């Protein structure tokens, strides 16, 4: 009894940590915004957004159904609370809090599928992993896929724990069919993850009920009919969103089966999942030999999907979230060494701090500051010159050398003249040239008769890491409107030494310095721009 109380206290502490990490401003990957917030910001709030290509291509490869099932409730709640005056940052925090809450479905599944003697060990080890504290609290489709994966295993195990002629077994079959279809519509990789549990539990179920073929047949009929009905419902829901009948998972499969398509997102060695991504996600546990024992069915729950996904050359760590999560659960059941568990927890803490707090954590504050700058209209630069922003006039915001900015957080009206552009791969010379070209197309002088003053209507903004311009002569013609000091960027170490990125950390919001003589804008380009040309 005392031991259970101790475990419960530790688990409560880990839950508090999970909720705390969910409220951070870290930015793990652009897809956590592109494939969720960008969709609902346009759909529910009427804000101007740049929809991701998966939803705008002629053959869409993403279904909106999983998003509607898992995320729509919290977005509707936010809209009901704030009415027409919604602020993007509270929406972000509420949604991450909601993701944290629904991640408890994984904890519930672990509690029910793990044997009693290893239940606390598995639950605590998983809860201490950085996947639970970071990835599962962010709005990734991979996180939603992981929830559906564990629910699938839960219903399969429940179906095996009761006779098939019991009424409750029909409910398990019904829920299993729905969850499986929703998981597949979330990501087609879901099929790779559920092959092993379906085979394992189906064989066990058949052996237990071999003398009841009618019950087996009835459950199969229920499973097939409910699955078919769910598929039709998903297709109809996608039709309402896209305006045409589309089978998104089929388009997704065709797209990802072509190497030339995958090459646009980056090609990796087919060994990346095994030798890089799984070790990254699982830390020191990956080196425990007993967890690789292929004679145990639990090993195949993670080994088979990793092998299948390794056949595709585009490989990212988040693609393995379900496999890595079940690997951690299995570790909690089999690993007895406290030293190995301690090393894993220390490793998880470091990764949780990095991904949950530090990683690209200046991007979201930078976007919010851009929103404030535009809404304030009158801004004083560090050189004490006044700039005037008119949201009704064309304004271009360039995001350079940072993750694709979550532009939904600008909360622009649907027909706003404020445009955004992400130019990650531009060189410094190309970026500065592009900036000035746009600036001289858009900048104007505005007379303010009430104040009897003349100010510049600034139009073009540049948001980028300050390290990229710190040692550049190009900086002399730019003025910084705002500085976000806390930003960890390890993606530009190929261009700048890591020490320089650390020393000159942070993100700056820049615009052109005042270039005027006698209240008129000169048509002469800055010297540095002429050198670019």
Curated annotation (Swiss-Prot):
This is GPI mannosyltransferase 4. One of its GO terms (molecular function) is alpha-1,2-mannosyltransferase activity. It is found in: Endoplasmic reticulum membrane. Pathway: Glycolipid biosynthesis; glycosylphosphatidylinositol-anchor biosynthesis. The chain crosses the membrane at residues 8-28, 61-81, 91-111, 144-164, 175-195, 216-236, 274-294, 297-317, 319-335, 338-358. It comes from Schizosaccharomyces pombe (strain 972 / ATCC 24843) (Fission yeast). Belongs to the glycosyltransferase 22 family. PIGZ subfamily. The gene is smp3. Keywords: Endoplasmic reticulum, Glycoprotein, Glycosyltransferase, GPI-anchor biosynthesis, Membrane, Transferase, Transmembrane, Transmembrane helix. Signal peptide: none annotated. Its EC number is 2.4.1.-. Its main location: endoplasmic reticulum. The lineage of its organism: Eukaryota, Fungi, Dikarya, Ascomycota, Taphrinomycotina. The keyword Glycosyltransferase applies. GO terms for cellular component: endoplasmic reticulum; endoplasmic reticulum membrane. Alpha-1,2-mannosyltransferase involved in glycosylphosphatidylinositol-anchor biosynthesis. Transfers a fourth mannose to trimannosyl-GPIs during GPI precursor assembly. The presence of a fourth mannose in GPI is essential in fungi. GO terms for biological process: GPI anchor biosynthetic process. The keyword Transferase applies.
